[in-house]
Amino acid sequence: MLSSLSPYMANPRNTLSQVLNFGLVLSSAFMVWKTLSVITNSTSPVVVVLSGSMEPAFQRGDLLFLWNRSPRVDVGEIVVYNVQGKDIPIVHRVMRVFPDVPTTGGKDVESVEASQKLLTKGDNNLSDDTELYAPGQEFLDRKTDLMGSVRGYVPAIGYVTIMLSEHPWLKSVLLGFMGLMVMLQRE
């Protein structure tokens, strides 16, 4: 077993360089993600459409770019939101905007900013999303539930992530292949 590692032990500088290059790639990707998060004011500035509920506007596997710096959302706008207690982003269209209702949360009503309340629906769905919301929730809160509004998309490119989540063995194969490429890379 140790004999297979001998080419890497013979030149530790080269091995260290490869490990550092791999770390640089990972940290650069993380920095780009965090920079996009700060610029767009969204915890997830890029999402993949996971279902066909927004067809024909967006197909399953489309990659969406979000923006969450607009103070208000309009009827007809396509938004991405998280349901309380679930971690799956949902992409749907705003069907109705309710009047702003200030929620005090134990503070003075005068010092509390009102948050927009929204009702959403998938273009390909028959009814609104109230069944998808958390139990007892009748609408979405703009500040707490929304991840952002869709500002752009790339068709079908996100299908890779769907394949990786539906077929876990593909993830192992891909990670193994990437690790092998890093180890066999010669500079």
From Swiss-Prot:
Active site, renumbered: S53 (charge relay system), H92 (charge relay system), D129 (charge relay system)
Disulfide bonds listed in the record: none
Protein name: Signal peptidase complex catalytic subunit SEC11
Positions in the Lumenal compartment: 34-187
Annotated CDD domains: S26_SPase_I
Class of the enzyme per the UniProt entry, highest EC level: hydrolase
Similarity field: Belongs to the peptidase S26B family.
Membrane topology: Single-pass type II membrane protein
Positions bearing carbohydrate: N41, N125
